[in-house]
């Protein structure tokens, strides 16, 4: 059976002026996703994907590097203004916002969207080291 040549589709370049930066800062990792107003992802990066492993993945510097990577990819899509939504208690919360600001993106608002239970599940036990 003859193989048919698969068509190579060129990636459609989106041109979006303003977007939303979703920062998910957990204790172990930081995930930054930049979307358009409708929620379609334009770019994303993680501390682990930036080359950090183990305990170094959960540092503010790793979150800063990940935010720079996601921000540069979003700037290629034309994003200039960004609204920041932070979720989670992790160490990369503040440094990732500073990194986006240092890239030259205009931050219109910063909001904390960390889900807070109305006394739902019992939290994990305290760590004993």
Swiss-Prot record:
Presence of keyword 4Fe-4S: no
Keyword Signal: no
Domain of life the protein comes from: Bacteria
UniProt record, GO biological process: translation
One cellular component (GO) term of this entry: ribosome
GO molecular function terms attached to this record: rRNA binding; structural constituent of ribosome
UniProt keyword list: Ribonucleoprotein, Ribosomal protein, RNA-binding, rRNA-binding
InterPro entries in the record: Ribosomal_uS11, Ribosomal_uS11_bac-type, Ribosomal_uS11_CS, Ribosomal_uS11_sf
Database matches in PANTHER family: 40S RIBOSOMAL PROTEIN S14/30S RIBOSOMAL PROTEIN S11
Family from the record: Belongs to the universal ribosomal protein uS11 family.
Quaternary structure note: Part of the 30S ribosomal subunit. Interacts with proteins S7 and S18. Binds to IF-3.
Role according to the record: Located on the platform of the 30S subunit, it bridges several disparate RNA helices of the 16S rRNA. Forms part of the Shine-Dalgarno cleft in the 70S ribosome.
HAMAP family linked to this entry: Ribosomal_uS11 (MF_01310)
Protein name (Swiss-Prot/TrEMBL): Small ribosomal subunit protein uS11
The species this protein was found in: Dechloromonas aromatica (strain RCB)
Taxonomic path: Bacteria, Pseudomonadati, Pseudomonadota, Betaproteobacteria, Rhodocyclales
Name of the gene: rpsK
């Amino acid at each position: 059976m003859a193989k048919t040549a698969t068509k190579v589709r060129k990636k459609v370049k989106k041109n979006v002026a303003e977007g939303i930066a979703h920062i998910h800062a957990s204790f172990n990792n930081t995930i930054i996703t930049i979307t358009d107003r409708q929620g379609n992802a334009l770019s994303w990066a993680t501390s682990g994907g930036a080359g950090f492993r183990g305990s170094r993945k959960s540092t503010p510097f790793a979150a800063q590097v990940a935010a720079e990577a996601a921000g540069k990819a979003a700037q290629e899509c034309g994003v200039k203004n960004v609204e920041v939504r932070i979720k989670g208690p992790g160490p990369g919360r503040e440094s990732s916002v500073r990194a986006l600001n240092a890239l030259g993106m205009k931050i219109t608002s910063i909001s904390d969207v960390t889900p807070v239970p109305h006394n739902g599940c019992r939290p994990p036990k305290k760590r004993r080291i």
